[in-house]
A protein has these predicted regions:
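Chitinase-like catalytic core of GlcNAc-active glycosidases
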Residues: 16-140
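Hydrophobic beta-strand segments of well-ordered beta-sheets in folded domains
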Residues: 6-11, 40-43, 89, 140-141, ...
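Flexible, charged surface loops at secondary-structure boundaries
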Residues: 2-5, 35-37, 135-136, 173-175
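Substrate-binding surface in catalytic domains of secreted glycosidases
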Residues: 108-195
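Short loop/turn segments at strand-loop or loop-helix junctions that form parts
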Residues: 12-14, 43-50, 143-147, 183-185
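N-terminal substrate-binding region of glycoside hydrolase catalytic domains
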Residues: 1-28, 142, 147, 156-157
Length: 197
């Protein structure tokens, strides 16, 4: 980080999934406080789509506001524990057509209660099909410009594929939200036997 003069860190605070039909934090962060000193920290919370399923949200008028409050409270607990001052929070959710309204409502409830600038991850398909997928009510989005293919035994690059990316970028200039871009800074190996991963 020092050699690359990285000043801003997006740190995954936790995932949120279901346990006993209730949203709970999964794998909370363990931060090396020395490595973040003097850096701008942006907490990132990955929200599994399952927490926005209609069987949880429909007919439960307090589910969304309670979820937003608990997410904010959990983020602030981590900030206090590590003595971090943050001004922005990012939510990462690959929302679907059936969960977008609940997810967007949670973002609005979060913004009403907490003073943070709010960003959200945006996938390529959410840019191309924005009329269907909707645009999250946040200050800006971060376009995830990676994980473009399936992991296969063929050797095709599943992290970045230019031809795949180009199929999704035709409507990028029309996207009504300011976008930053997240580029891949990783690699992985795929082990296969008999054509199977």
């Amino acid at each position: 980080m020092k050699n690359n003069r990285i000043e801003r860190l997006y740190i995954r605070y936790c995932d949120v999934g279901l346990r006993d039909n209730a949203p709970v934090p999964i794998a909370p962060v363990d931060i090396d406080t020395l490595s973040v000193q003097g850096k701008t920290v942006i907490p990132v919370v990955y929200l599994k789509n399952e927490i926005f399923n209609s069987e949880l949200t429909e007919g439960n008028s307090t589910y969304i506001s309670t979820l937003a409050h608990r997410l904010g409270d959990y983020i602030e607990q981590i900030n206090r524990y590590y003595r971090l001052r943050v001004s922005e929070v990012q939510f990462d959710c690959d929302w679907s057509l059936s969960t977008k309204q609940a997810y967007f409502s949670m973002l609005e409830a979060f913004k009403k209660e907490y003073p943070y600038q709010l960003s959200a991850t945006i996938r390529l398909h959410q840019v191309k099909y924005r009329e269907e997928t909707g645009v999250p009510p946040v200050d800006y989005g971060v376009l995830m410009y990676y994980n473009m293919g399936r992991i296969t035994a063929t050797g095709a690059n599943s992290i970045y594929d230019r031809s795949t990316a180009l199929r999704y970028l035709g409507k990028l200039r029309e996207y009504p939200l300011p976008l930053d871009i997240a580029l891949p800074m990783f690699a992985w190996g795929v082990h296969s036997a008999d054509g199977q991963v």
